[in-house]
Amino acid sequence: MAAIRALQQWCRQQCEGYRDVNICNMTTSFRDGLAFCAILHRHRPDLINFSALKKENIYENNKLAFRVAEEHLGIPALLDAEDMVALKVPDRLSILTYVSQYYNYFHGRSPIGGMAGVKRASEDSEEEPSGKKAPVQAAKLPSPAPARKPPLSPAQTNPVVQRRNEGAGGPPPKTDQALAGSLVSSTCGVCGKHVHLVQRHLADGRLYHRSCFRCKQCSCTLHSGAYKATGEPGTFVCTSHLPAAASASPKLTGLVPRQPGAMGVDSRTSCSPQKAQEANKARPSAWEPAAGNSPARASVPAAPNPAATSATSVHVRSPARPSESRLAPTPTEGKVRPRVTNSSPMGWSSAAPCTAAAASHPAVPPSAPDPRPATPQGGGAPRVAAPQTTLSSSSTSAATVDPPAWTPSASRTQQARNKFFQTSAVPPGTSLSGRGPTPSLVLSKDSSKEQARNFLKQALSALEEAGAPAPGRPSPATAAVPSSQPKTEAPQASPLAKPLQSSSPRVLGLPSRMEPPAPLSTSSTSQASALPPAGRRNLAESSGVGRVGAGSRPKPEAPMAKGKSTTLTQDMSTSLQEGQEDGPAGWRANLKPVDRRSPAERTLKPKEPRALAEPRAGEAPRKVSGSFAGSVHITLTPVRPDRTPRPASPGPSLPARSPSPPRRRRLAVPASLDVCDNWLRPEPPGQEARVQSWKEEEKKPHLQGKPGRPLSPANVPALPGETVTSPVRLHPDYLSPEEIQRQLQDIERRLDALELRGVELEKRLRAAEGDDAEDSLMVDWFWLIHEKQLLLRQESELMYKSKAQRLEEQQLDIEGELRRLMAKPEALKSLQERRREQELLEQYVSTVNDRSDIVDSLDEDRLREQEEDQMLRDMIEKLGLQRKKSKFRLSKIWSPKSKSSPSQ
């Protein structure tokens, strides 16, 4: 009896000094309800006006106490005011259980985590108490079945909370009167069976088993604050249901309305372009971190352009990672292009893992995959499995990321190239394999070759007469070229020789110099335009590398010098041979095709070696790193001293490359190109506008005044097909709906186990009343009730978490739409827009207030929770049950609390 006496003593202390309140037992002393009101007034005098209460008003007193405790403290009404009036001796176990919740609340925390105050609707408060009194309606009706007929009070989320806490309160059948009352008040409104104290749940005047209180539509157990009443008496439904989630509790869906988009992780990781498109359509404004490798973001429709097919593309294919070398979409990809992203530190790479078949574009025949171990006739270092940097003129590059429209620089480049060449000069594979150029990639036979060759000869002769500028000093004309051409590892030693690394220069048809300027090629410009800044720079550099003969080294310059008397073709072959000997085998073998630039540019090119050796003021020489894994990973790094280009011996070849007229300089570096820090950054107007608008939006003051507030999904100018996720989901404490559901299901299982134990323990308690074993059983009962409270507390915290996350996402959506409306001048706003703006403001304020309420409630709970462990320990010590400590380890009991705290 020590446990009961200890609780009784606590009640006596709390009620001391209150008139008409005398705690001499745990039954009749509480019948008039004044004791309950006194305890509440002692701790919360603001909730009850005790001086206005009268001892004879039994029903009103009990009703007031039960209502206040439920609405403001979150303590479920386990007792019924009508039962207290009807029974001369109230059920002792019910009162003990109910009062123990008062004790726990004022010494620790609310059984249900203090959710009631936040979730309960104030207008329903008066009817809720009566609802809690299932016995009231039941008492009026002859049988449990009719008990359903009385009209239900307005839907209230709070009752759920009550049921979850501790349904314990039906008067036990101790006496005839008690039995009569308990029979009526302890019957489940769904199954019609007896409801034990530990199973009791009162909602809107009906008593239910906790396990019977399920959603009518999805049959999921209803959770605190996540259900509503229906037009049919005694039936409730979830506020929202999880989409096709059988095991998930419906309440979670309501908390995560944006779930279809929330699962953006799935949509953005999907490997199928079609799936990515579907996901994008489903949530156009969803916030998801743009995955660098997401094909969805690359779904910028590529405008088919005949010129694009002839554009020079850079294919870097590493034998170890062939799947990454696909820059061109497979024919089946439709408009979804693999996006080129700066996925690796080495540079830009094709980030479309889904485009498995994109290894080569249809326009590029077998020549594209060209793993040729054999070295060209030059006999340079064997290019065995060196990563192939194939600069292939094909639509692959353009197809990789086709911009919505040609940029000015790209269009001019295309025109210039078309002027000199009808088709690409060299097939991607010819450089290494030595096999003849493929029909699709080779220049239209002699016509284009001879035309370019003749033009170059004339230009070179004119340059020789004019003379070349000092070796270390790039002329203004050439200075422009280096900027467009990133400093390759080998300062484009004879551009003629190195670009064409094919076994025979004849196969190439034109020396790399003779080919149209690769940097200006439509493919490179189109790619760069569609890429992010980093990606565009790397792409532009890769194009420049192609022109320069990326794999060539300073040594090729010597061949160029002595080749002054020889034809360009011979000079090229000589330089090629030497370049192979000195330069990396893989680079030379693969980079030959890039050199397709206009003759004018090639004439400017001779000076590039010097320009590379001495970059423009403030610029450090750069080289193309030879190591890359898969898809074009081209990075510019400072040239090592030993790799700085040696000034080529003065010879006709160098003089021939003396500064060209300004017009040629314009050809090499179009005015439309933004040359910054040696990076070519052509951007399509559409993308520039989007990026600029995005930056402007970020600079705008946020409605909340939070400088770091992320843009809402509705306000972010997402690219076509781009999927983004809400910033809320990026928070380290964010719990996905699936994780919350998993934890709730785990709590559900543990609650079921506790209820089974509680049913057996209740039977033993009623059978052992007055025996010596009663005190020990009562301690066990208190512990069981407390464990249940802990589980319900975890459940309420999860619900808090879920609701808070939903409100935060909702706030972002409202904020984005509101910001757009407020950005519009008042004079231009329509009446409908003004109304919508006002409505959004009200919603915004309401959402913020709801979030604040949740935070305040949780803070209050934390303060109470800090004392709970010690208070419970003191209670056990007062009972003199030290032997129980080994059985009831506090570490075990409080482990759920420690687990639930991180979820906050």
Swiss-Prot record:
Residues 698-807 are annotated as: Forms an intramolecular interaction with the N-terminal Calponin-homology and LIM zinc-binding domains-containing region keeping the protein in a closed conformation. Residues 1-107 form the Calponin-homology (CH) domain. Residues 807-903 are annotated as: Mediates interaction with RAB13 and is required for transition from the closed to the opened conformation. Interacts with RAB13 (GTP-bound form); competes with RAB8A and is involved in tight junctions assembly. Interacts with RAB8A; competes with RAB13 and is involved in E-cadherin endocytic recycling. Interacts with RAB8B. Interacts (preferentially in opened conformation) with ACTN1 and ACTN4; stimulated by RAB13 activation. Interacts (via calponin-homology (CH) domain) with the filamins FLNA, FLNB and FLNC (via actin-binding domain). Exists in a closed and an open conformation due to interaction of the C-terminal coiled-coil domain with an N-terminal region including the calponin-homology (CH) and the LIM zinc-binding domain. The conformational change is regulated by RAB13 and RAB8A. Adopts its closed form upon interaction with RAB8A and interaction with RAB13 causes conformational change from closed to open. CDD domains: CH_MICALL2, LIM_Mical_like_1. Residues 267-277, 408-433, 564-578 have a biased composition (Polar residues). One of its GO terms (cellular component) is recycling endosome. The modification Phosphoserine is found at S110, S143, S153, S249, S294, S494, S504, S598, S649, S658, S660, S726. It comes from the Eukaryota. It comes from Homo sapiens. Residues 723-874 form the bMERB domain. InterPro entries: bMERB_dom, CH_dom, CH_dom_sf, F-actin_Monoox_Mical, Znf_LIM. The modification Phosphothreonine is found at T644. Residues 117-178, 251-722 are annotated as: Disordered. SUPFAM superfamilies: Calponin-homology domain, CH-domain, Glucocorticoid receptor-like (DNA-binding domain). Residues 143-153, 363-374, 647-661 have a biased composition (Pro residues). It is a peripheral membrane protein. Residues 293-314, 349-362, 385-400, 459-480, 520-534, 542-553 have a biased composition (Low complexity). This is MICAL-like protein 2. The lineage of its organism: Eukaryota, Metazoa, Chordata, Craniata, Vertebrata. Effector of small Rab GTPases which is involved in junctional complexes assembly through the regulation of cell adhesion molecules transport to the plasma membrane and actin cytoskeleton reorganization. Regulates the endocytic recycling of occludins, claudins and E-cadherin to the plasma membrane and may thereby regulate the establishment of tight junctions and adherens junctions. In parallel, may regulate actin cytoskeleton reorganization directly through interaction with F-actin or indirectly through actinins and filamins.
